[in-house]
Amino acid sequence: LHKAIRRQRQMCIRDSRQPLYRYLGGIDLEMPQTFHNVINGGEHADNGIDIQEFMITPIAKTSFRDGFEKIVNVYHTLKKVLEDMGYETGLGDEGGFAPNMKNSEEALKALHESIIKAGYKPGEDIGIACDCAASYFYNKEDGKYHLEGKVLTDDELAAYYDKLLDEFPELMSMEDPYDENDVEGMVKFTATHKDRIQIVLDDFICTNPALLKKAIKEGAGNASLIKLNQIGTVTETLETIRMSRKNGYNTMISHRSGETGDTFIADLAVAINGGQLKTGAPARSERVEKYNRLLEIEEELGKGERLAFFPDDVDHD
């Protein structure tokens, strides 16, 4: 797919003589809501945190640049907070920190403190999201979730998530809160939480229109994670985006681990109008290049560019 993307970009430049985001999206464009992975756990880290990613997202912003600057401030403040707590601050593959914490509550407390120390209000200026990647701690033999020293049923896992949501109301989005094969758990959680948080489907749908159609019919999730090189073609990727929007699902364009410096997803996130973008922390060159591209696009669009706002202003057209 990366080769197809490069060919498409070359054709766009040669034939249309316009930026890729305009070629893909026309004139109805919107700068994306970005989600930045800043603390790693699960398979991405060797620590006591079973939830895989903790992200921050700019809620209050006057421009894309303004929101990104807020994220950078919180990121650097988090580094200092972790150092003061006695944790090492080496960077993982996606630019996030992997402190040797005991559990997810510690990670959320560190983020909460960092947002405040950076001069912002949790839940008003900066929100938190997480990729639970529940398949990592789901035990197929007993059908339960082995999470940070606890063995939990579907309902007990929901109660655990409720505890986090009550303690940290700035937690606004959860990706893959249940195992990809635990349809009953995911559907039940969606029914009780869809009006409270964004529930993002990744492993559950794999950017596959057929799997998304099944999830919609079952009532699972309210947002789709879109990975460009997961389904195999740009056409199928765009079909998954269209189906999501048609059925009221938010869309989050995502990087992959082992990401390259290719910036196509930045153009696509703008082109699909009102999408969200998950592409790592504001660190490491392959991540920063995508944010630099978004800043370039904002400059090209000029003053008055439209901004996607989360969670209250998502365009499903």
What are these regions (language model features)?
Residues 29-92:
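Mobile "lid/hinge" segments at catalytic clefts and subdomain interfaces of large enzymes
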Residues 2, 44, 255:
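Histidine-centered active-site/metal-ligand motif
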Residues 53-64, 88-104, 133-148:
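Active-site-proximal beta-alpha loop/turn segments in soluble metabolic enzymes
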Residues 24-30, 39, 60, 205, ...:
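Acidic, glycine-rich active-site loops and adjacent beta-strand->loop/helix elements
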Residues 84, 105-317:
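Catalytic core of soluble alpha/beta enzymes
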Residues 21, 25-40, 121-134:
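Glycine-rich, aromatic-flanked loop segments that form ligand/cofactor-binding clefts
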Residues 1-13:
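Single conserved hydrophobic/aromatic residue that forms the stacking wall/gate
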